[in-house]
Amino acid sequence: MIYLVGTPLGNLEDITLRAIRVLGEADVVACESKERALKLLSHLQIKKPLIYLREASRASDVKRIIELHKQGKTVAVTTDAGMPGISDPGAYLVRELSAQGIPFTVVPGPSALCMSITVSGLEEPWAFLGFLPLKEGKRRRELEKFLPLNIGLVIYEGPHRVGKLLSLLNELCPQRKVALLRELTKLHEEVQVGYPHELIKDSYKGEFVVVVYPSQEGT
């Protein structure tokens, strides 16, 4: 069997009992980063062989996972943090498994997407954009496609680009409030809510979720 296992965003105490059992019973654990996987497994006192499932090599990595499954091995698939399949190569794995009729099971766990909805108080409808394109023109077009819908938007962003995203939001929708969520579940977790220009600063640290609220005026 192939399991897609949700793992903590940062606080290792967020691991579920079912996830611990599945990781302990698996023959192999697939991961994006062996360093992060080893940190979690060591905390749980679990030793397992590790293989990669990374975006850059997802085709060959998925092929290996499927081969192990056909050999009768149990594979637990993880991501660096949160749920596999959300803005990571787990989505490609699921499509390939479904296309080949290979069964798999999801072991639910922490999700930055779900937590950001709860923390921000965002109401439906909303859209999850994941990580926006790297190129500025494509990022702009993506936002210009969704902003006129006047629904909540949830965006993942790293420390080196979040300032540029806020500047772009300040240009495109300065009247819409934004929740800037940093280092969710971690020691330095921080939630800031304001207009884009109020959240812009020279530098940022940590991983971010940016929530764009609908316009209060409905425009």
Swiss-Prot record:
According to the record, the segments passing through the membrane are none
This enzyme's EC code(s) = 2.1.1.198
Q: Name one GO molecular function term.
A: rRNA (cytosine-2'-O-)-methyltransferase activity
Q: Which GO terms describe its cellular component?
A: cytoplasm
- Top EC category: transferase
CDD domains, sorted:
RsmI
- Keyword S-adenosyl-L-methionine belongs to the record: yes
Describe the reaction catalysed, as an equation: cytidine(1402) in 16S rRNA + S-adenosyl-L-methionine = 2'-O-methylcytidine(1402) in 16S rRNA + S-adenosyl-L-homocysteine + H(+)
Q: Which family does it belong to?
A: Belongs to the methyltransferase superfamily. RsmI family.
Tell me the protein's name: Ribosomal RNA small subunit methyltransferase I
